[in-house]
Curated annotation (Swiss-Prot):
One of its GO terms (molecular function) is oxidoreductase activity, acting on paired donors, with incorporation or reduction of molecular oxygen. Residues 127-225 form the Rhodanese domain. Catalyzes oxygen-dependent 5-hydroxyuridine (ho5U) modification at position 34 in tRNAs. The active site is at 185 (cysteine persulfide intermediate). This is tRNA uridine(34) hydroxylase. The gene is trhO. It comes from Prochlorococcus marinus (strain MIT 9301). SUPFAM superfamilies: Rhodanese/Cell cycle control phosphatase (SSF52821). PANTHER family: RHODANESE-LIKE DOMAIN-CONTAINING PROTEIN 7-RELATED, THIOSULFATE SULFURTRANSFERASE/RHODANESE-LIKE DOMAIN-CONTAINING PROTEIN 2.
């Protein structure tokens, strides 16, 4: 498997997805996985599909064509990237109440959402003095990169976003009826659902970046790029740089926070055991458990290296 050029596809679609069809698609994807090197994560719900998958191009094509038959060949938002290595261990398929959890069942992006803004027009919108820009991602994602002058709601998860809107959004608006509200996220799904929430609450000029940060970085040359830092992704790569290559961050396997090269040089950092974000979060028993886990990981790496050399 080493040296293969893997295709990584992030995709989502909001559409009415019936229970029997969800189970049918799940079973067909498992069949494809059994016969091919397919990995990633799918989340299915009655509101649609959300997922990121990794495989060779021909396998990806099979999966996309299959999914399109369930979405009636429309509204499947796709972002493509490549990697020399697999970015997931295996394929996971989860069936949930929502494909991205906001916790408000009546929010339905397939019926009413904000206005899509493509990458080419995004810079103009966010430079407009009558526009506020909101990063709808989690605080640890925002911490490693975001758009210039964007507002950070500082949420731990997306389900906290509605409360932030109720408590804080109006304080950022000069006029609820005339101020532009531009929102973005990694691939477009969270900001799309966020626009539906705001439209339901009566906000009028609501926009979201089509395809999210990933599409923007793919479309806009570096010299015109207004995104600063790296973009967090939910796979082994941890973060992507401005060229959509693997970035400089790693994950602290104790707390899950992204840690930079500089963070790893701090005295608090112990690989797999703790970082400066979580040094006060865990007990000594926890750390002993983390240390043993890291030793097992290191042993497996050595064994796998020997196998490949042979």
């Amino acid at each position: 498997m080493k040296g293969k050029n893997y295709k990584i596809v992030s995709l989502y679609s909001f559409f009415p997805f019936q229970e029997n069809l969800i189970l049918d698609l799940k079973n067909k994807l498992i069949e494809i996985e059994n016969e091919n090197d397919l990995s990633g994560l799918f989340i299915f719900a009655n509101e649609g599909i959300n997922g990121t998958i990794c495989a060779e191009k021909n396998v990806i094509d099979i999966v996309i064509n299959l999914i399109n038959t369930y979405t009636d060949n429309k509204n499947l938002n796709i972002k493509v990237n490549f990697s020399k290595n697999k970015v997931f261990k295996k394929l996971k398929i989860k069936i949930k109440k929502e494909i991205v959890t906001m916790g408000i069942p009546e929010i339905n992006p397939s019926e009413n959402n904000g206005t899509y803004i493509d990458s080419a027009d995004w810079n103009k919108l966010i430079k407009n003095k009558n526009t506020i820009v909101i990063d709808t991602r989690n605080h640890y994602e925002v911490s490693i990169g975001t758009f210039q002058n964007s507002i950070n709601p500082n949420t731990k998860n997306f389900s906290e976003f509605p409360k932030w809107v109720d408590d804080h959004l109006d304080t950022h608006l000069e006029n609820k009826d005339s101020t532009n509200i531009a929102m973005f996220c990694t691939g477009g799904i969270r900001c799309e659902k966020a626009t539906t929430l705001l439209k339901k609450k009566g906000y009028k000029n609501v926009y979201h970046l089509q395809g999210g940060i990933l599409q923007y970085l793919d479309d806009i040359p570096k010299e015109k790029n207004l995104f600063e830092g790296e973009c967090y992704v939910f796979d082994k790569r941890v973060a992507l740089d401005q060229e959509l290559e693997k970035g400089s961050y790693s994950i602290c396997h104790a707390c899950g926070m992204p840690v930079s090269i500089q963070d790893q040089e701090r005295k608090e950092y112990r690989k797999g055991i703790q970082c400066h974000f979580c040094i006060d979060q865990f007990s000594e028993d926890d750390r002993k458990r983390f240390e043993e886990r890291q030793k097992q990981i290191d042993r497996l790496k050595v064994e796998n290296h020997k196998i490949h050399k042979e």
